[in-house]
């Protein structure tokens, strides 16, 4: 089967941390015999390339100097920087529609798979104008929350995109539920996952030792400020906090830790190697994903870092928000707390750290859940079924 994935951005070089789960999905689809390409935007004039064995076709949309609406940060974040960037989406979409139409006239596909339908549903429409192909649309959640939290004019567009798709897929049950409030169409739920190393030789963490661990970009929706406050609530004899990742909120978080008197117990490690990250997961007493709803209405679509931590048998505590409950069963494979409630978060952390038996039980159950529900074999099988259904029509 010939498949074209349509995305806003895709890795340019090794080490480019852009949609790693999608890269892995495509590599595995190709390994199983499918002919899979990527269609995405250029970055400062970058042309077509082969990335990790994957053919990547890039379209130009503006002058090289300003051709950076994507890749370095999200397009909405970039658009806040200047009037020029707020105008660029028009050029981006127009150029993309013409480019994908030309591309699909030369290269025939069985399935056009659009990720993030706002605005890429327009590129999917243009691709189908070039020749018959099934259209699959994946909704990650942020598009739906834009509609719910201020951008009401997008409601009709998102409904149109869903109705004209042969198959619609959401990455979590929460995203599917929110999308059904906008448009009444059948929606599959297929989570994304990550490549999980074999940890059979890695000892399960000692629950009463090691730091509290967070991994992710330091932005508002990750809720790290509430985690810092929760650690402070655990008192002078509380655990240390290890923060891996970087982002615009780092200076404020460092200042907050100092103001709470725990600067000596909060370690900001920035970016680390894969090997260092794996060691951090394995030695952590508990992993925390304290996500919240940010000012733009965005939150955690799924929370793939939870899968990474659970793979090591590390107990997890996370917010009950977005797609997180699809991964963590409260009281079974982890603990869930109300988003933004640092007191509840502190209580959950204290409970796990003080009870080694609970920590081990949660860790073992989490590890089993990852193996059963989020394996690549299961997810690839689901996508094959969706693609076959899309090519057969309604």
Segment roles from a protein language model:
Residues 306, 311, 315-318, 328:
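Short hydrophobic beta-strand element within catalytic cores of glycosyltransferases
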Residues 37-40, 55-60, 134-140, 155-201, ...:
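Donor nucleotide-sugar binding/catalytic pocket of nucleotide-sugar-dependent glycosyltransferases
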Residues 282-297, 314:
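Acidic donor-binding loop of glycosyltransferase active sites
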Residues 4, 194, 203-231, 242, ...:
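Conserved donor-binding/catalytic core segment of Leloir-type glycosyltransferases
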């Amino acid at each position: 089967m010939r498949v074209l994935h349509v995305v806003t951005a895709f890795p340019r070089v090794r080490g480019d941390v852009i949609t790693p789960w999608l890269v892995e999905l495509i590599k595995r689809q190709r390994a199983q015999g499918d002919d899979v390409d990527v269609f995405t935007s250029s970055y400062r004039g970058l042309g077509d390339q082969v990335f990790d064995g994957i053919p990547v076709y890039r379209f130009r949309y503006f002058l090289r100097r300003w051709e950076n609406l994507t890749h370095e940060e999200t397009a909405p974040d970039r658009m806040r920087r200047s009037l020029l960037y707020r105008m660029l989406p028009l050029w981006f979409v127009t150029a993309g529609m013409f480019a994908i139409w030309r591309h699909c006239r030369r290269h025939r596909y069985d399935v056009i798979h659009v990720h993030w339908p706002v605005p890429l549903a327009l590129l999917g429409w243009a691709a189908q104008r070039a020749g018959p192909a099934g259209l699959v649309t994946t909704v990650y959640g942020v598009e739906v929350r834009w509609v719910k939290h201020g951008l009401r004019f997008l409601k009709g567009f998102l409904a149109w995109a869903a109705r004209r798709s042969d198959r619609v897929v959401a990455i979590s049950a929460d995203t599917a539920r929110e999308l059904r409030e906008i448009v009444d169409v059948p929606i599959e739920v297929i989570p994304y996952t990550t490549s999980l190393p074999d940890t059979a030789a890695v000892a399960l963490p000692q629950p009463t030792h090691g730091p509290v661990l967070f991994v992710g970009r330091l932005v508002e929706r990750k809720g790290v400020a509430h985690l810092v406050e929760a650690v402070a609530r655990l008192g002078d004899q509380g655990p240390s906090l290890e923060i891996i990742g970087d982002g615009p909120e780092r200076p404020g978080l460092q200042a907050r830790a100092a103001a709470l008197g725990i600067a000596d117990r909060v370690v900001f490690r920035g970016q680390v190697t894969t090997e260092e990250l794996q060691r951090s997961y394995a030695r952590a007493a508990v992993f925390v994903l304290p996500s919240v709803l940010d000012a733009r209405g965005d939150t955690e679509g799924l929370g793939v870092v939870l899968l990474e931590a659970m793979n090591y048998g590390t107990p997890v505590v996370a917010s009950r928000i977005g797609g997180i409950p699809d991964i963590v069963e409260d009281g079974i494979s982890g603990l869930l707390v109300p988003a933004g409630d640092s007191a509840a978060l502190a209580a959950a952390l204290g409970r796990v750290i003080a009870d080694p038996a609970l920590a081990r039980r949660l860790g073992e159950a989490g590890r089993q859940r990852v193996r059963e529900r989020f394996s690549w074999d299961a997810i690839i099988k689901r996508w094959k079924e969706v693609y076959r259904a899309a090519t057969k029509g309604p």
